[in-house]
């Protein structure tokens, strides 16, 4: 395509059905998709990340509305959306009144077909049907048994969490012990916390999570409610114990979920510090900084009265850190943690204080004032809980 000057570059390409402006392609996709959905009394499920991705894949976006078998709506919405999004780059469509997914999808073609895109939409529907048929089979297998089974427990016991920290089931047992003791601080029902802890990693060995690993926790929540008849707080804790996943992620509100999330992050921090796998510079392969910040957000956002420094150093948490440390040191030399009681304060000061300093400075005080306050402050979480 000959271009004689920079001025006619865009117009020449447009004539050849190439839109060079990314924002224009995004606008066209949104407008056409919204119009097609509105014509059927539906609405587009917003997905900014997918919009960015699709806008970069097409030069001349042509939006089409496809159909899928209504039987697939028996699958969890997260499974349908992930299959559409990850594998096919489709947008989900829902009923604006119920917010439930509709048996349709939006696909963006890169060509204006002579038949108006009917063949393209039909072809994409067949591909999606194959994907969702697999997902439906996996879901049927997973829902045939309760979430907790001895078979799944045995599988977790064979999955290595870390060579020096044992299996995933070893971690579950440590988290359960920590969570039970944390109940006094969080006000959570110990029986429900124990039940949630036993279930929290079970979905890692389900067929559905094997196919869609991004749905860990979410699948467990669904299966817990369906097959175990668990209360909502237990089911929610299975999903929410991973949260917050980052600075912009929501913080759990239910006491059971808060307790389990704290225990899970505490076990991770204690464990990796014990085997000398601390973050260095920009390297943090086990996301320990995120875990530390997550603990701080859980404590401050929920007003949990946990005095991490004084309670541990003063021996007021009998066995909490020692139990984790002992479980770990059985696999390592005794000098791994010396002394055990000094471990947790070191972790919180090193991993958490820098996170707190940055967060505190950004919302309530200049950095120099924050540094002066934190220099002699021992009980960071309690201090923040009283002031944020």
State where each predicted segment sits.
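Amphipathic alpha-helical "coupling" segments that flank catalytic cores
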Residues: 1-388
């Amino acid at each position: 395509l000959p271009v004689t000057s920079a001025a006619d570059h865009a117009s020449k390409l447009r004539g050849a059905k190439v839109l060079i402006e990314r924002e224009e392609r995004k606008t066209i996709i949104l407008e056409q998709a919204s119009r097609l959905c509105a014509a059927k009394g539906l609405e587009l499920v917003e997905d900014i990340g997918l919009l960015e991705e699709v806008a970069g894949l097409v030069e001349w976006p042509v939006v089409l509305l496809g159909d899928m078998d209504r039987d697939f709506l028996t699958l969890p919405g997260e499974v349908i959306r992930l299959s559409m999004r990850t594998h096919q780059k489709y947008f989900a469509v829902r009923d604006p009144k119920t917010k439930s997914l509709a048996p349709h999808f939006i696909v963006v073609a890169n060509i204006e077909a002579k038949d108006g895109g009917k063949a393209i939409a039909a072809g994409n529907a067949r591909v999606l049907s194959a994907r969702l048929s697999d997902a439906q089979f996996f879901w049927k297998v997973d829902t045939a048994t309760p979430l907790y089974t001895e078979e799944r427990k045995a599988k977790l016991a064979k999955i290595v969490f870390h060579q020096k920290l044992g299996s995933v089931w070893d971690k579950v047992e440590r988290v359960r012990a920590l969570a039970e003791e944390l109940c006094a601080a969080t006000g959570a029902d110990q029986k429900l916390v124990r039940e949630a802890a036993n279930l929290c990693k079970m979905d890692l060995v389900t067929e559905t999570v094997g196919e869609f690993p991004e749905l860990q926790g979410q699948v467990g929540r669904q299966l817990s409610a369906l097959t175990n008849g668990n209360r909502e707080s237990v089911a929610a804790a299975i999903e929410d114990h991973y949260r917050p996943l980052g600075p912009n992620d929501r913080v759990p509100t239910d006491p059971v979920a808060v307790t389990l999330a704290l225990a899970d992050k505490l076990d991770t921090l204690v464990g990796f510090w014990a085997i000398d796998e601390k973050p260095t510079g920009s390297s943090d392969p086990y996301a320990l900084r995120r875990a530390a910040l997550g603990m701080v957000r859980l404590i401050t956002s929920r007003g949990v009265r946990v005095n991490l420094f004084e309670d541990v150093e003063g021996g007021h948490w009998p066995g909490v850190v020692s139990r984790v440390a002992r479980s770990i040191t059985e696999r390592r030399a005794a000098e791994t943690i010396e002394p055990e009681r000094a471990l947790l304060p070191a972790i919180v000061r090193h991993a958490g204080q820098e996170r707190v300093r940055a967060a505190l400075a950004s919302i309530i005080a200049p950095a120099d004032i924050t540094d002066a306050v934190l220099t002699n402050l021992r009980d960071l979480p309690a201090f923040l809980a009283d002031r944020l």
